[in-house]
């Protein structure tokens, strides 16, 4: 092996050693976390013509010890009003998927019989971003290790706050939006607990120091399971009013017997343990059983309908038969970034989640509402008139007994209650409004347990009023909505407003957030690059030093133009005093020798000053042409 080959082999050996060290150090660094781009949904099977609503979907880990992951589906707003808003929607159960809300209630699309998607007229994404979350763990597309299900409301709340913190890390440009929580049924327990946790979180010094408070602006709960005591005791009065059960009959006596058992249980229970009481659950079941005729029974979610016994409403709404197969298609789950290794198929409601979530140690959320209202948080409760399971009479009785801000129920002053104001929408009698001291109640006539399923346009009008959207300065076709005969703020349901100024503000906000995200995501890469640069620098320094020790060629590091043999360069330094080579960096020669050699080289160059300068010379025409090629290449790549 020759000297040059030995030197090359030595250099490669050194380089490979340092490369191995660099890779080992890189492996010690944490794996780069997912970015928002990893959750982007660029298309959906069956999507309608035209641009798809901007959306992101996928899993976020909230408990690594139990493999607990929440699934979310986020839809960006279609237009911006005066400011950006985000609405988090939760379905109930417990254990029922929020994809019900996304595809049957307030989301931008609904699934047709042939599994196509149709745009919903009156969807809530017109002026607000929508975030649907499958929770607790194990619900819908969310997953968790077997046996690690949540059983109490404080556990659920803690996991949900963790999810929100991680979600805002992925999507920081939404963190300062006005934030609302909405949902129905058992979400009447979830939402007040989450709201309480957010308000408490905002008071922490660590959160305030980082300016990471969340702008919680209001809650909307439809047909909510908020006060179990009031709901249990409202079943028979509601059944009497709606003609489901006739008073003085054997059927009514059987129902009254179950109520007596429930009352005994309620009278011995303390504040906690009253969210789920088996003896009280029997009241609803007895009423439903009394409607059993042939193979049919009443639909407990919409008393205008019947269902096969013993489903009695579990097969409703009719869109469910389209949604379940659609959400199980492989190309749909792939588009939504579902982890196929952990989630085998979408189910509307999980028996395992519901069976474990008994909240036996949790107090009912009705006890949280007064303080939330007193702290200035607006709350809107709405009910569908034809729902039995979470009927409006139970909600109204709860409000009547609730005390907050120095009054009881909707008292304006002692003995004076806020009036019920008739609500008409597009010429039809839609229901009534009642409001006092931060609480609003809306009853929807002829509506079921899932009011947005029946009336998407009316619920959108209700939403826009509650969150303060006024299209007067935005544009769009106003909806004819009147409360107590007054039009109030102008809303636009299903219109196409123009909001250029607000859109520009949102664009700038997202641009700023994007830069912050880039800086954050680049931290790990920057560390790796810095380590690699240091190692590479050390390697180059050592290689050059070794080269100077072993090279038989002249040193060109001080005056490069004197090192060209073609133009009278310095003669190579010869071995002296037993040295194999002169080490310039180590000053392995005396100054007199260097002066003599430089003097001879300069004299030699002076005698040939008439020769053309050739060191590093480039042909200008070739350089210009090369630049042109590079520019053409850039154009091609773009």
Curated annotation (Swiss-Prot):
The record gives the membrane topology as: Single-pass type I membrane protein
Pull the Cytoplasmic topological domain ranges from the record. Answer: 542-638
**List of glycosylated residues:** 118, 331, 438, 446, 498
Q: Write out the catalytic residues in the record.
A: 185, 387, 449
- Write out the transmembrane intervals: 521-541
List UniProt keywords, sorted A-Z: Apoptosis, Carboxypeptidase, Glycoprotein, Golgi apparatus, Hydrolase, Membrane, Protease, Signal, Transmembrane, Transmembrane helix
Compositional bias per record (Polar residues), positions renumbered to this chain: 489-502
Q: Which ranges are annotated Acidic residues under compositional bias?
A: 583-594
Q: Where are the compositionally biased (Basic and acidic residues) regions?
A: 622-638
Might you give the EC number(s) for this enzyme? 3.4.16.6
What residue ranges lie in the Lumenal compartment? 34-520
Q: Which GO terms describe its cellular component?
A: membrane; trans-Golgi network
InterPro entries, A to Z? AB_hydrolase_fold, Peptidase_S10
The region called Disordered is annotated at 477-507, 567-638
- What one GO molecular function would you report for this record? serine-type carboxypeptidase activity
Function statement: Protease with a carboxypeptidase B-like function involved in the C-terminal processing of the lysine and arginine residues from protein precursors. Promotes cell fusion and is involved in the programmed cell death.
Its protein name is: Pheromone-processing carboxypeptidase KEX1
Which species does this protein come from? Answer: Blastomyces gilchristii (strain SLH14081) (Blastomyces dermatitidis)
